[in-house]
Amino acid sequence: MCQFLGVAQEKGILRGRALEKGTKEPLPNAAVTIVGTFYQTLTDFDGNFEIKDIKPGTYSVKFQFIGYQPILFNDIRITSKKPVNLTAELQEQSEMLNAVTVVGRKNQVDLEKASSAITLTGNEIGKLVAKGVEDVLAQQAGVQRTTDGLQIRGARVYETEYLIDGISAQDPLAGTGGGVSVSSSSVGSLNLMTGGASAEYGGGSAGIINTRIKEGGEKFSWGLNYQTDQIVDATSFNTDELEVTLSTPVPFTKKKLRLFTTARGQWTDHYFGSTATQLKSSLFPDQPEFWAPRQSNDYTHTVKLSYANKTVGKFTLTNSHSLKVNQNSRTLQIVGFDALLTPGFQYDRSNNLDNATTYTHHSNLTVLGWNKRINAKTGLTISAGRLFTNLRADANGRPFRAETVDQIYDEAYIFTGDLTVFNPNDPYGNYYLIPGNGLINNGGVTPIWHDHYAAENTFKGKLTFQPNAIHTISGGLEHALTEYQWVDVYRPWVGAPIVLNDSTTTPSVSIGSSNDIWKVSPQKGGLFAQDRIEYKGVKATLGMRFNYWAPGKFADNAVADSTSPVLPAIRDAYNQNSFNAGGLSWKVRLLPRLNVSFPVTENNVLYFNYGHSMRMPHPRFMYAGLDPQYQDRSFLSSLGNPNLNPEVNISYEVGYKTLVGSRIGWTINAFNNNRFDYIVSRRVITTDATGRPVTKTMYINQDYAKIIGVETQLNARLNNSFTSFFNGSYQQARGKSNSARESALQIAQTGEVPLTQEQFLAWDRPWKFN
């Protein structure tokens, strides 16, 4: 027994040297860490090191030296039989700090992160069955894909922050959570953070999706991919896909300037059966057969230039462009506000799709980035971007409305085909007509006409300072100048002139039966600071973010104008809760962040994170109907609330990560997300431009939700060419209401909202496995 214990307690030894790559000079005081353990030491004056009493196993060893790029050696096997020698040659950094060079295969789980985050490289994405970024994300734990979009950990689709090369690529007005689309082949890396995001990120209360576009390689390469389902007609949805990629160094630049570009088109008629004769977009009126040959038409194009030089650092220029033309009603939605959760196919118009709502979503993002290591301890990253996105919904390319109305357009008031008389023997003569199967096929047109655009100019800067091997301090700022225009008209032909005879025409009296029209220029931004501490295996990040925003002159003028319909209580609260600077009214909020991880045993890490995050309310609920000269007089029209606050999430998470050898990684975590200040609708009484009292729908911060859940993921590398993963999750999403409109409906039906009762929310998906 004593002899057995003596053998079991034998330990291994790791020794080696840290050198400068170019000169082979030793690097004294370089930090050497065995990841996922408490083992850590510094090199001596000659660059040598030795770590004793290591439990036998397979580890990752990390070398760090201030001013040099860290190196991570994976699959280092420590045994008790003989010491393991390891020499690391570190290269001086010319770009951003903390970029790590990995030697060996990528670990199946990252033991250094105290968060729920996954990073996929372009090669890993290429092995998945995925055509776009959303397809890749839908396969991850905690992510649900529904008809509305991607929902992360029980949150609503619009709560996720979607970035391309660090700049927002999200349409802030569409309500879908998406915006600029990119193909999976253009992705260099995809980082999904569902919990524990750092203070650098401040725009998403559910999660962060950061896509890095590929850069051109050292050699010329190109690719062509074409797919179709029309080989066998019996199973065809009339789908075609074409994608072209190109990667090359630019001639005469000594391979310092590189180009990557990809273009992709996807055309399909889907599986619904019914299709329009020809989709038409009023944004692209010429050649509709080219832009919309099928029922759904998606185009993406991405190009990236990169230039690296040791003296000036690294510059990148990215442009991503996407266009969608389809009849999917989920293209425009305010889910979680007042839209119903329904599929996107317009079933009631399936016999009349030539007059159904056609959506055109056109987006363009340009990002200029620069990063440079200023000295051995300091690095700087700067990026500037412009996002422009435009969404149009109309009656399959028809103009807004004709100059005069000479026919009935309302689908509900045109009856054709077989009609059945209901209640024909009623003694009072009350007869009802049942219009066949109820599907619209009568020459009427959709009552929806919508157009919005968003232009965002964003600047970001981040400074990183590493005074020693223990602390890495970073701070920065972000500021966005925005311009939003919203035009939403229902039944646009209502109020148009009517020709009475050859000489008499009625005047135009309204823009549709109801409308919502505004143009605003709000601003938003944030400051952040954080300190990442690494000491003997323990890693902690302490961060704080200071977010600020200004609703803009439009809201300020509406509050200051006594003739505007802003309620007195809202006007007083707006003035009390904001401060003036630069001619605008501003609001602020502090968002603390904390991440901690520490090893329990070798290659077994426990982590915890806590954080506050926020999401700005949809602009529609802040600005609708505030212009005193232009107001919607329809019943229960919307009235903006400029004093709305952001929706807030306070999250807690605890998790456990383990590496079993070098081939298997396992993670399990539990989270608790408490969401506050969700927006709900209420009916209020105010006065219109004529002074008469009117009832309007206004929105306030009052709702909440609570989401709890457990997630697990298992990654395995079976051999050099075959890898596999499994993930599963269980969660509960509970709250008072599914949408902003639901609470108002409860008041209308019962006279109250049960404040103490919760229900499972409509988007709650308890179980998911991949």
Predicted features, each with a name:
Residues G6-A99, V103:
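Periplasm-facing N-terminal accessory domains of Gram-negative outer-membrane beta-barrel systems
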Residues I13, S236-T331, T358-L380, P592:
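Transmembrane beta-barrel wall of Gram-negative outer-membrane proteins
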Residues Q69, D75-N85, A99-S198, I208, ...:
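Periplasmic N-terminal accessory/gating domains of Gram-negative outer-membrane beta-barrel systems
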Residues G104, L224-T228, T261-W267, L317-L323, ...:
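Transmembrane beta-barrel strands of outer-membrane/channel proteins
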Residues T381-G385, V605-Y607, G611, F621, ...:
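Membrane-embedded beta-barrel scaffold of Gram-negative outer-membrane proteins
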Residues W549, F671-N674, T686, R692-N770:
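Gram-negative outer-membrane beta-barrel transporters
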Residues P288, G443-I448, A455-T458, Q466, ...:
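Signature of Gram-negative outer-membrane beta-barrel scaffolds
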